[in-house]
UniProtKB/Swiss-Prot annotation:
Glucose 1,6-bisphosphate synthase using 1,3-bisphosphoglycerate as a phosphate donor and a series of 1-phosphate sugars, including glucose 1-phosphate, mannose 1-phosphate, ribose 1-phosphate and deoxyribose 1-phosphate, as acceptors. In vitro, also exhibits very low phosphopentomutase and phosphoglucomutase activity which are most probably not physiologically relevant. This is Glucose 1,6-bisphosphate synthase. Gene3D superfamilies: Alpha-D-Glucose-1,6-Bisphosphate, subunit A, domain 3. Alpha-D-glucose 1,6-bisphosphate binds at R73, S175, D336, R337, E434, S436, K448. GO terms for cellular component: cytosol; nucleus. One of its GO terms (biological process) is glucose metabolic process. The active site is at S175 (phosphoserine intermediate). Keywords: Carbohydrate metabolism, Cytoplasm, Glucose metabolism, Isomerase, Magnesium, Metal-binding, Phosphoprotein, Transferase. It is found in: Cytoplasm, Cytosol. It is an enzyme of class 2 (transferase).
Length: 622
């Protein structure tokens, strides 16, 4: 009897007006319990309410996600600040409202939806389910939806948006983030990620459409609506056909004795990399059996980010040794990024950094262009791009070879946007990259692409093998010709936003108000560029040429010794990242000296500017 009474009391509590003492929270609780139709996430909020956990309720319900460098990204779970059924429905309603305003032919052209293999049992939240709900919201409004019938690499969504002439698309993914996370990555009609003002306008529309519409929860529409189409076979076929544009040695590939191991990090990449190798004439790469199939728990790696290096590549490296394969290729869980490693003569593995791979890609794509260009092709119309925190090696190659190099803000959305401008003006973009192992060869896709990058590295390695040159040896040749570019990138974790803000504000008011530092330890600073405020001391008017980005922190220091160092916050994770590079001329070949100088400068940067002990920063652990 007592148990029944308690149950009745709890039931009454959950259906009565809420009196937490915080009117904003009371309203948010009521909205969530009325709107959420997912039993598991609804129960999470009910349990918090029942147990009087008002602080956690406030954290979950009284703030919303905002667009970062990769759209919406957060942990999966109950609450308006998390990725879940309700927030994805709200986001898609906002998307619909904005797209309806922007495109009079929205209901003729349609919308693309793709997804990876993430999922969380406790919130009954998976990428596939979120993709179906995204489609359902639009189908209920009579919008044609191209919903992939199975998981796909992230690059397939921007590719499909372009090829199908859709107005926009969404990929449900959190890429290489921890297993608890998911995301909502938005592409515009151009096939590039959205930039301002679209992101801000979409957020406004989301805030105006928070209550689910009739039909928004009806995921049965995915199975019954004649407006739902499956683009998988068509897009996969066209994508693989377009890959041939960046294949230059198919016959050589078919004869190579090199063997490759590929790991897809428990994600989507396996089938698509196998197909890409076939297109290029290769035998299939050897898959890592434990990591070949999708697994939302990423069971065999401590974090699903191949950028973390040898510690997360262990299974693939051991398999390569067993199979006598010299090159290991690792695509991240949504297959938009690539890591590569090569076995050296001393039996050790060389895991290439993103900047080192970019040096090889830059050399390779330009070399192939020179050998295959048409008679009237002009090198002055050729471009390569990189984000401003990435290596300057492409700049050095461009200066010597006569093509153009440009920098963009961090994030491939800026690269994609700039590529569109260049293509519209008759320019040719051969290659673009960001240091965090994001590469784009050619312009068939306007986002980073791990599938195409993997097979291009394989072709490069096979070509070099015919001359008895390894990837590492070719990298040295690139540096000897264009100048050594020695870089180091790492990060600190910081879970306190006020601490992050105070670190950067201190740098803006270092010795006195509105004065940036003139030295970092003993290292003299030549120029300072602050993207957050739009300041650049190297410009005559002291204004940055790159767009201002007030929502993120980013300061770049150029030193008198030729080093460039950037401190910035991550758009998707609680990190302060640092990027430092020594850019040497070709006559400076003492790498040990350059590395020692870089190490000393980084130590000074950390000690003087970040002050990890004082600020409670957590060192990256690998």
């Amino acid at each position: 009897m007592a148990e029944n009474t308690e149950g009745d009391l709890n039931s009454n509590l959950l259906h009565a007006p809420y009196h937490t003492g915080d009117p904003q929270l009371d309203t948010a609780i009521g909205q969530w319990l009325r709107w959420d139709k997912n039993p598991k996430t609804k129960e999470q909020i009910e349990n918090l309410l029942r147990n009087g956990m008002n602080k956690e309720l406030r954290d979950r319900l009284c703030c919303r996600m905002t667009f970062g460098t990769a759209g919406l990204r957060s942990a999966m779970g109950a609450g308006f600040c998390y990725i879940n059924d309700l927030t994805v429905i709200q986001s898609t309603q906002g998307m619909y409202k904005y797209l309806e305003r922007c495109f009079s032919d929205f209901k003729q052209r349609g919308f693309v939806v793709g997804y990876d293999t993430r999922g969380q049992v406790t919130s009954s939240c998976s990428s596939q389910r979120l993709a179906k709900l995204t489609a359902a919201v639009l189908l209920a409004k009579d919008v044609p939806v191209y919903l992939f019938s199975r998981y796909v690499p992230t690059p397939f969504v921007p590719y499909a948006v372009q090829k199908l002439k859709a107005v926009a698309g969404v990929m449900i993914t959190a890429s290489h983030n921890r297993k608890e996370d998911n995301g909502y990555k938005v592409y515009w009609e151009t096939g590039a990620q959205i930039t301002s003002p679209h992101d801000k306008e979409i957020l406004k529309c989301i805030e105006e459409c928070v209550e689910p519409w009739n039909g928004s929860w009806n995921d049965n529409l995915v199975d019954t609506s004649p407006l739902k189409r499956d683009p998988l076979q068509d897009i996969c076929r066209r994508y693989m056909e377009d890959l041939k544009k960046i294949c230059f040695y198919r016959e050589l590939n078919s004869k190579t004795t090199l063997k490759f191991v590929h790991t897809s990090f428990h994600g989507v990449g396996h089938d698509y990399v196998q197909l890409a190798f076939k297109v290029f004439g290769f035998k299939p790469p050897i898959p890592v059996p434990e990591q070949k199939d999708p697994d939302p728990d990423f069971s065999t790696v401590k974090c699903p980010n191949p950028e973390e290096g040898e510690s997360v590549l262990e299974l693939s490296l051991r398999l390569a040794e067993k199979e006598n394969a010299r090159v290991v290729l690792a695509t991240d869980p949504d297959a938009d990024r690539l890591a590569a490693a090569e076995l050296q003569e001393n039996g050790c593995w060389k895991v290439f950094t993103g900047n080192e791979l970019a040096a090889l890609f830059g050399w390779w794509m330009f070399d192939c262009w020179k050998k295959n260009k048409s008679r009237n092709a002009d090198v002055k119309n050729v471009y390569m791009l990189a984000t401003t925190v990435s290596s300057k090696i492409l700049k050095a190659i461009a200066l010597k070879e006569g093509f153009h190099f440009e920098e963009t803000l961090p994030g491939f959305k800026w690269i994609g946007s700039r590529i569109i401008d260049l293509l519209e003006n008759g320019k040719e973009v051969l290659f673009a990259f960001e240091e965090s192992i994001g590469f784009l060869c050619g312009t068939s896709v306007l986002d980073k692409d791990g599938v195409s990058a993997a097979v291009v590295v394989a072709e490069m390695a096979s070509y070099l093998e015919t001359m008895n040159i390894t990837l590492k040896q070719q990298l040295v040749k690139v540096y000897e010709k264009y100048g050594y570019h020695i870089s180091k990138t790492s990060y600190f974790l910081c879970y306190e936003p006020p601490t992050i803000k105070s670190i950067f504000e201190r740098l803006r008011n270092f010795d006195s108000p509105k004065e940036y530092p003139k030295f970092c330890g003993t290292f003299a600073i030549l120029h300072v560029r602050d993207i957050t405020t739009g300041y650049d001391s190297s410009q005559p008017n002291k204004k940055s040429v790159l767009p201002v980005s007030k929502n993120s922190q980013m300061i770049t220091f150029t030193f008198q010794n030729g080093c460039v160092a950037t401190l910035r916050t991550s758009g998707t994770e609680p990190k302060i990242k640092y990027y430092a590079e020594m850019c040497a001329s070709p006559d400076q070949s003492d790498t040990a000296l350059l590395e020692e100088e870089l190490k000393k400068l980084i130590d000074a940067l950390i000690e003087n500017f970040l002050q990890p002990s004082k600020n409670g920063l957590i060192w990256r652990s690998v």
